Design a protein with these regions (language model features):
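Short, polar/acidic, helix-capping and beta-turn segments at strand->helix junctions
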Residues: 1-101
């Protein structure tokens, strides 16, 4: 039996050493999620954990490739944490329609 999406989420969170169970802080005056019909739009996810932006700068210039990978994981986990919180379970997510950077 494959692990649930929530279990996989928790495993990745443990691997990178951050919990995404609390409030997902945003850094401006915008709404991070908008629900419309059966879709959730998520915006503005940066590599922030709590009140700290963990990685800054351009990969290859101000930051390493490894730091860039960590930043991408944190952004992805933040983007998944929001529907997990609003829906209660990532198993309810049917598909991800689009990701833009």
């Amino acid at each position: 039996m494959e692990p649930s999406r929530n279990k996989l989420f928790e495993q990745v969170a443990a691997e990178i050493g951050h919990s995404f169970d609390g409030e997902i802080a945003i850094g401006g005056k915008y709404v991070s999620t908008i629900e419309q019909a059966d879709e959730i739009y998520i915006s503005g996810q940066i590599p922030r954990v709590g009140s700290t932006v963990v990685v800054t700068g351009r990969v290859g210039a101000e930051t390493s490739v490894e730091q860039g990978k960590l930043a991408a994981k944190i952004c992805t986990m933040r983007a998944l944490a929001l529907p997990r919180q609003s829906l209660g379970d990532l198993g309810r997510v049917k598909k991800i329609l689009r990701v833009t950077v």
